[in-house]
Regions:
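Extended amphipathic ligand-handling, pore-lining, and cofactor/metal-binding catalytic surfaces
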Residues: 4-152
Length: 152
């Protein structure tokens, strides 16, 4: 996992980034979750090798967080639902986290670029941020010019 974000989440405003430890703001009774957001897949074998593997790695690396997942593709969620597998979208997953008593949430997308999916995710989070004491969104893999230069 290439994100040092999970416990050292980026809180940004006006284009500046400030590293702060989300866990340091937890008080007695607070609960922290890491919501992994994926586009999704309808292929069970692919899901096991990719999405499930990423979620498992997050569980291993960040045991202080409850790891949850959400999918962004409505088409994939609908196809999975027809087969009896329900996947929550980000707004549903955030509402469920609130219902389950979580107070601090980091949302990390597995999107590669900062495109339409990330913009939609930002809107979901903005509309629900009042539900939590703290909620943060991690950057996609390729976010800064430096990120692109590293893979060029």
């Amino acid at each position: 996992m290439a994100c040092g974000l999970f416990s050292q989440a980026n809180a940004h405003g006006d284009g500046n980034y400030v590293h702060s430890d989300l866990l340091s703001s937890l008080q007695k009774g607070d609960k922290a979750a890491l919501l992994m957001v994926h586009f999704g897949t309808t292929h069970d074998d692919t899901r096991q090798l990719t999405i499930d593997a990423i979620n498992q790695k997050a569980k291993e690396l960040f045991p202080e967080f409850e790891i949850r997942e959400a999918y962004t593709s409505r088409i994939i969620m609908a196809r999975l639902a027809k087969r009896g597998t329900r996947k929550l979208n980000p707004a549903e997953a955030l509402a469920q986290l609130k219902a389950d008593g979580f107070t601090h949430v980091i949302v990390q997308s597995t999107n590669i670029i900062d495109g339409v999916e990330m913009e939609s995710l930002r809107k979901d989070i903005a509309s629900m941020e009042f539900l939590f004491k703290e909620i943060r969104l991690g950057n996609p893999l390729l976010y800064s010019v430096e990120d692109y230069e590293k893979v060029a």
